[in-house]
Every structure is written in C-alpha cells, then in structure tokens.
Amino acid sequence: MKVVFMGTPEFAVASLDAINKVHEVVGVVTVADKKAGRGKKIRYSAVKDFAIENNLTLLQPEKLKNEEFVNVLKELNADLFVVVAFRMLPEVIWNIPSKGTINLHGSLLPDYRGAAPLNWAIINGDTTTGATTFFIEKEIDTGNIIDQVEIEITENMNVGELHDSLMFKGADLLVQTINKIDQGKAIVTPQAELITDRIKEAPKIFKDTCQIDW
C-alpha cells in the first residue's frame, strides 16, 4: 500500500522505519528546518535524517494549507496518510487519501487526549498506559479507534523509559493497523462508546506544571 508519513521527532522514526519495511512510503512530511543552539546552526528533524538516509521523497512545507503543497500530496496518489508526533492537520490534508488518515497516539484513548499523554500518565501515578491508532477527524484525538496496545508502567519508570518502550510498541501497532486497512479488515470503535466517566486529560506541559509542592 502507498503511504505518506508525517512526523518529526525520534519517536516517529521507529514507526517510519517499520512501515518502510513492509509498505511503499511515497512521501515523508516533516517540519521545515530551523536554526537552533548558540551557533544558530540548521538542525534537521530526526524524521528528515531518516528520509535522507533511505532516499525517501521529502516535503517540508512552511504552511500545511499551501496550495502547492496540497497539490504535491495529491499527486503522490497515496492510499493512506500516517501521522506520528506531528502538527494538527487541516481537513484539506487529512481528507486527501482514499483510505483516510490515521494517527498513533501515546495513550489508551479516550483517556489522555492532548499533547503530553506520557507525562500525565506518570504524574497521575497510573500503572498502565498504551498506544492507540485512530482515524483523524476534525476534533483533535477524537477519531474512531482502530487498534490499541497496553503497556505496564513500572514503579520506578520515568517518562524517558516510557517513551522508548512505547516508541517501538507503537511502531508495531501501527504496522498491524496499516495491514488491516490494506486487507479491508479494520474494525473501528467510536470513542464515545468507551467513555463511561470523566476522561483523563493530557494538556501541554509548562514550567509551572513541573513545580513540586513540598
């Protein structure tokens, strides 16, 4: 199946690598290059580094609604778009592929919708979390669920360790999901069917959030 992959950090690279081994990645979308550090040197995203190393078609739009970028995506004629740790997509983008656009999220949705699901699972003292694949819709992290995988949060596990574990578990889950979609075997569950009580939230982490009340 032809796939366009969208992602930025190291977390996304494991998924791109896994997908590239079993499906045709016809395009990779990542953030535009930015200057960073004291020397203000250009730094590539981890996903860009992987795309270059593996000779994959690379796109780095400044604006996702740019007409030229949208047309290039359409010309790639991908069956499916896959999103891992990227920006919120406008409908004009996620509506392009015939089989839809899916996202990998680092929680067991509908819990921990938002930007920092791993952090909040640790902060709240959860003993389990996981990853979810779902179809992207207008509202962020609310689309129909396709697959989930659960992972234990051990007593002394930190966010970095949880990140690394979910990075690979999530990549395997994503390939499983793509295979199901390719074979016409994907069965979805609306998130509304899973909400029985107040759901946990995962807003962006700020400095104030990190203050400890001794």
Which sequence ranges carry the predicted segments?
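Short, structured coil segments at secondary-structure junctions
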Residues: 21, 54, 96-97
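Active-site-proximal loop/hinge segments within enzyme catalytic domains
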Residues: 138-214
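N-terminal glycine-/serine-/threonine-rich beta1-alpha1-beta2 phosphate-ribose binding loop
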Residues: 35-79
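Residues at secondary-structure transition points
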Residues: 38-42, 113, 157
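A residue-level signal for conserved active-site and pocket-lining positions in enzyme catalytic cores
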Residues: 7, 28, 51, 81, ...
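N-terminal Rossmann-like dinucleotide-binding module
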Residues: 1-39
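Alpha-helical oligomerization interface recognition
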Residues: 62-132, 136-138, 142
